[in-house]
């Protein structure tokens, strides 16, 4: 159910290297407080009134109760969402992370205004049926289409958003849909990583029992100042 070896390599820093996880300093302080990192994105929020929301929060609570919870910063429940297509973020101003028609020095406000104009009238599928496939490394729930047809619809939606926004990333096709529950703040020892893997299995088992499938949508264009809040600008349904 979970790629344990990849998770251990990530949690210990062997996969990416560096003194600390990439989110520290860019998205969060060393203590887990959010820092300013404005941008826009296209997402599906998880309905707070849904059984799926309660199941995700319960899985997050299992992780919070672990002995290594302080190594993570956990997302507020009302920010839980699944990204359809990543937009722009202020600290990532490179040609492969920025709309091809915009100068790299364009402000986030200008980039967001451009995105809203390009997506006006863009109609996404209204609902997406997805299923959880794993809890990876104690911080993210891997998601996939509930069926092959649903997975194909998700991928076609990503492709359409890529083309509308003129934002072509080299890793576009390898993207794994997910719901982020937390961010890692420090590298772990292998023993600590193994403990997180076991806790992730426990959380995944409970999550799959409570939420074998969920429906998300409609898609939204959202803006953010930090990773704690994603404000809807518009639905992508007309």
Residue ranges and their predicted role:
Residues 1-238:
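Histidine-dependent nucleotide/RNA phosphoesterase domain, centered on the 2H-phosphoesterase fold
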């Amino acid at each position: 159910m979970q790629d344990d070896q990849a998770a251990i390599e990530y949690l210990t820093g062997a996969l990416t290297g560096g003194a600390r996880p990439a989110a520290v300093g860019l998205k969060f302080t060393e203590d887990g407080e959010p820092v300013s990192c404005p941008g826009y994105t296209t997402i599906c929020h998880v309905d707070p009134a849904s059984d799926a929301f309660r199941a995700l929060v319960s899985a997050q609570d299992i992780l919070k109760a672990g002995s290594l919870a302080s190594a993570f910063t956990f997302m507020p429940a009302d920010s839980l969402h699944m990204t359809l297509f990543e937009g722009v973020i202020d600290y990532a101003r490179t040609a492969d992370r920025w709309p091809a028609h915009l100068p790299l020095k364009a402000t986030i406000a200008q980039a967001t205004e451009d995105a809203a104009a390009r997506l006006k009238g863009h109609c996404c599928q209204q609902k997406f049926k997805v299923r959880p496939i794993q809890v990876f490394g104690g911080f993210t729930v891997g998601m996939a289409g509930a069926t092959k047809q649903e997975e194909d619809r998700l991928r076609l939606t990503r492709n359409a958003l890529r083309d509308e926004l003129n934002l072509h990333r080299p890793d576009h096709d390898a993207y794994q849909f997910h719901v982020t529950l937390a961010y890692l703040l420090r590298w772990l020892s292998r023993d600590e990583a193994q403990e997180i893997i076991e806790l992730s299995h426990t959380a995944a088992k409970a999550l799959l029992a409570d939420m074998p499938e969920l429906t998300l949508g409609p898609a939204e264009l959202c803006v953010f100042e930090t990773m704690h809040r994603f404000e809807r600008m518009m639905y992508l349904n007309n």
